[in-house]
Each structure stands twice: as structure tokens, then as C-alpha cells.
Amino acid sequence: MAEQISMIGTVILMMVVDFKKMAVEFRKFFELDSTQNFPALNIAEKKLCQADAQFEFNIIADADWYYKDSIQAYYKHRSNCHEIGIKESVYQKARNGDHSALYSIAHEISHWGLINYFKLSTGIPESEQIDPITKVVFIKIHENIADLLTSLLVFSEEELLQAKGAGDLDLSSFMSKDQLSLAHFYCQNHKTLKENFMKKLVSHITAQKNNSELQRRIS
């Protein structure tokens, strides 16, 4: 159930948030244009430290890594510390140009950007008393939009559509099938989603105004 609810929440955000525009703006923040590769490791090691006095980039020895093996990096947001941590072996892979390792770092940079740059946080503070299912839903939504922003930072819309469509472009070394499916859904439907949302919003506002006018006349 949490998975279904979080996907509905993600689609609603797709209706009201222009993630393509966000990706362009975030690239400009790092002085990158649309033709340049996204230098995830350089940004994490240098640029974020310059941009955010509370940012830390930490390399964790494999022996001290307390997350499951499938997690290559993490982002932690605290009041006095904004941290990206990465497993040492994954860091070495990133230095050698490994696609999956670099994409994982880019994903954590997206988390930093959503919370600190765009102020778009769907996370739950640890001190907040909330039921477990709701907490999982919020976490999943935040992961989904971080996945989406990352895909748009690293690839063009055309590349994402080609990878899912004709299969001419293989992005499996960068992202999972679920991440690619989410990016493809957005690229294929974001205009329609936004148009439908605006139509429904205008229709709802008009109906409310008409109802208010009717109530005024009756009274």
C-alpha cells in the first residue's frame, strides 16, 4: 500500500512541479550548461563544500559501512550538518569513472538540492511522531523525486526516451529499471499531466465561484 500511495504522491508532484526546469536551474547553480556532463564527484568533493558551509563529504571504509550492500552512498540532513557519505570501494569506482558509482553520487546531490536549494523537502524529521506507513510513504516520495531530478541532471530528455523506447541507448549501467521507468514516464507525460492539472484546477475554482454565487442568491 505504501508503494502505491507514494507513487500517487509522486505523480501529483509531477503535475505541479516542473522538474525539467529545476534540473536546468540546478545545473546553472554549478555553472553547467545543457551540453556538459554532470561531474558528480567534483561537485560532491569541491563545489558543494564551497557552496554550503555545513556540507560534508565523507568516505566510509567498507568495514565500517553499516548500510546494506545495495546502498552505495547516502545523504543525511541535520540542522548543523548536510552530509553525503560514500562507501570507500564505491568512491574508488567513481574515481575510475564507474557509471553506477557516479550516478549514486549524483542522486545524493539531488537530495541535497531538493532540501537546501529548492526547499522542497518531503522528508520527515526524526523528532516527528508519525505512524510507520506514513513515514515510509514520505521517504519513498522523496526518493522518487530525487531519482527523477538525477535522471534529468545526468541525461537529456531525448536520451531518456530513446533508452526506454527503441533501446538504442543502454543506460542500465547508470540506473535501475525502476528509475528509468519513472524518468521515461515523466518525459513522456509531463506536459499532459500539467495541462490536465490546470484544467481541473480552473474547473474546480469556477465551480466554487458558481456555488458561492448561488449560495449568496439563496441567502
Feature locations, PLM:
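Active-site hotspot residues in diverse enzymes, especially metal/ion-binding acidic/histidine motifs
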Residues: 1-219
